[in-house]
Amino acid sequence: MQSTLCLPVPSRSLLRFLRCQSKRAFASANHGRDTITTSAIRCRARSLNTVAIRKQSLALTTACERRVTTVEPSLFDKDPVTRKLPDRNQPLTSQNHFSTSRNAQGFWSGRKSSSSYMPTWNSFLKFAGKKNEKALKPDDLPNHDEFGDNSSIFNNRRTLAAKAASEPRLRCTEVDEHGNVILVDGEFKKTELIAKFGLLPRDLRKIDSSNLPHILIRPSAILLNLLHLKVLIKHDRVLLFDIYGSKTSYPQSAFMYDLQGKLQQKTAPGNASLPYEFRALEAVLTSVTSELEADFEAVREPVMHILSELEDDIDRHKLRMLLILSKRVSTFEQKAKLVRDAIEDLLEADDDLADMYLTEKTHDLYRGEDDHTEVEMLLESYHKLTDEIVQEAGNLVSGIRNTEEIVRAILDANRNALMLLDLKFSVGTLGLAMGTFLAGLYGMNLENFIEETNWGFAGVTGVSVVFSLIVCWYGLTKLRRVQRIKMMDAERPAIARGQSYFPDDRSALGLLDNRNREMLRRINMQKAVSQQKKKWL
């Protein structure tokens, strides 16, 4: 009973094999697979020399093979080897033992077939291999090409590190609750900003890839994208984004100065002060409206100068400058309209206005949808400013359009004058041609009775001149009639005394002229009186 309960003890050959395997495996990693396999074969051959410990040697050989398969993945890539080996948690009857010879595979397959297996000398001699057995080829082992870059855990880590390094970062300046700058040009990942400030990925997408003005209200933040400012407002923090990596511009510097002044100002004890987020919001809107006014003044002055010059002289260069300035004014008007619409959309959303009280939310105070008087008055004041800027820009655009139409009309009138002059010359040329026609008749070498008279030359010349003048007079008269511009084809006909005039219903004059309406009223009254007289008679 005691012999059956004793655990098997490792033999010297097993210990020698493990020592040899550890030395050779760590000495050369490139040939580690062949070395380990050869050591495994030697271990099996030595373990078969003693018949008394055959069962123990078989169990230990199985353990050696398991240890070999455990060491190999640590030296090489893990996935291709483990892909070819079965799971260690499977029962022994379903395991495919790793071996480099066909005889060994046959030995283990024979062992699977019979549960009461008793090894014989023939099965032990199979480990030595046959004489005609082919040598081990490189194709029998896993190929190095199978160990791709994606199968290595180190390469996966490198890929993740590269993705993390290539993740876009946002530069920002942070201001604390006291108006002090605590971070200048700090870099944050988008994931960090999303996790830290409770935002959504689409919110940051509107910051870094959208140029349209937006005012987004979130449960714990206010996100603004207005012209040159991209700001995140918390109940005690303000972040000014600079995603393009450019240097600090003058409008942003002026905004930071104004923001610090508004956040650091102290109100009197009796006066109620605005919350932190509203003071920051007011600084943003002030900077945006100031920038709009500065841009409008920069555009308005050259436009007015060009318009005044075009009144005196219409030049090609001035018209070209007017075209360029009109495009700039149209772009500015569109930009101002977008800012006004963004503020107007926020004013129409009562729930967003109520959610803008971030400081009260930190104290678990929530307002109703209609209780937002302070922020509504603040936004309405700046909405009026932006609307005035939009109206002024619209007036400037309409002035440019009117000037263009007037210039076009003047150019058309000049073109018509040139065409009229051309027609006059054509009429004069026609008259001279008719006079020379008569002179050409007498240029033929034919005999006539006028040649022998003394008055022939004077008569023919006089007739030619008179005929030319008649043709010119007729042509100029027709041209003068064509030159007149009339609103109607036919003038008002003359009305004889005692004859009533009934305007044509098809003409606009009969409906719009006050005199005609009064005449119609009198005629109707006369008809009514005459009908009454007939009744009395």
From Swiss-Prot:
Residues 90-112 have a biased composition (Polar residues). Its main location: mitochondrion. One of its GO terms (molecular function) is magnesium ion transmembrane transporter activity. One of its GO terms (biological process) is mitochondrial magnesium ion transmembrane transport. CDD domains: Mrs2_Mfm1p-like (cd12823). It is a multi-pass membrane protein. GO terms for cellular component: mitochondrial inner membrane. A motif (YGMN) lies at residues 442-445. Keywords: Ion transport, Magnesium, Membrane, Mitochondrion, Mitochondrion inner membrane, Transit peptide, Transmembrane, Transmembrane helix, Transport. Residues 79-112 are annotated as: Disordered. The chain crosses the membrane at residues 425-445, 456-476. It comes from the Eukaryota. It is found in: Mitochondrion inner membrane. The keyword Magnesium applies. The keyword Kinase does not apply. Residues 1-26 form a transit peptide. Signal peptide: none annotated. Belongs to the CorA metal ion transporter (MIT) (TC 1.A.35) family. Homopentamer. Forms homooligomers. Interacts with MFM1. High-conductance magnesium-selective channel that mediates the influx of magnesium into the mitochondrial matrix. Essential for the splicing of mRNA group II introns in mitochondria by affecting mitochondrial magnesium concentrations, which are critical for group II intron splicing. It also suppresses a variety of mitochondrial intron mutations and its absence may disturb the assembly of mitochondrial membrane complexes. PANTHER family: MAGNESIUM TRANSPORTER MRS2 HOMOLOG, MITOCHONDRIAL, RNA SPLICING PROTEIN MRS2, MITOCHONDRIAL. This is Mitochondrial inner membrane magnesium transporter MRS2. It comes from Gibberella zeae (strain ATCC MYA-4620 / CBS 123657 / FGSC 9075 / NRRL 31084 / PH-1).
